[in-house]
């Protein structure tokens, strides 16, 4: 009887191990970085140079500076997912 319980316990443990979700690839993982917004308290003006960044909110911002403005205005923790458009 003890052997049978041991086999059942091992089978259940194996099912739990096999059933774990494993990321398919590192590409699917999203890494973000904090924008540099310290200068925004001194002068909140952004240049008109188009240097887009993709925010964690899924919005493409014209520049990192514009993303900083959105962070301040909306009081949200928007970070940069990647340089370029979303």
UniProtKB/Swiss-Prot annotation:
Gene3D superfamilies: 3.30.60.30. Residues 31-86 form the Kazal-like domain. The keyword Ribonucleoprotein does not apply. GO terms for cellular component: extracellular region. InterPro entries: Kazal_dom (IPR002350), Kazal_dom_sf (IPR036058), Spink4-like (IPR039932). Disulfide bonds join 37-68, 46-65, 54-86. One of its GO terms (molecular function) is serine-type endopeptidase inhibitor activity. It comes from the Eukaryota. Synthesized in duodenal goblet cells and in monocytes in bone marrow and blood. It is found in: Secreted. SUPFAM superfamilies: Kazal-type serine protease inhibitors. Residues 1-26 form the signal peptide. The record marks 48-49 as: Reactive bond homolog. Keywords: Disulfide bond, Secreted, Signal. Inhibits the glucose-induced insulin secretion from perfused pancreas; also plays a role in the immune system. Does not inhibit trypsin. This is Serine protease inhibitor Kazal-type 4. The lineage of its organism: Eukaryota, Metazoa, Chordata, Craniata, Vertebrata.
């Amino acid at each position: 009887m003890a052997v049978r319980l041991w086999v059942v316990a091992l089978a259940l443990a194996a099912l739990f191990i096999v059933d774990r979700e494993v990321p398919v690839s590192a590409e699917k993982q999203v890494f973000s970085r904090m924008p540099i917004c310290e200068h925004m308290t001194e002068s909140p003006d952004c240049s008109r140079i188009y240097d887009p960044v993709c925010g964690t909110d899924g919005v493409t911002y014209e520049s990192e500076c514009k993303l900083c403005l959105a962070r301040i205005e909306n009081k949200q923790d928007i970070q940069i997912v990647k340089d370029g458009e979303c």
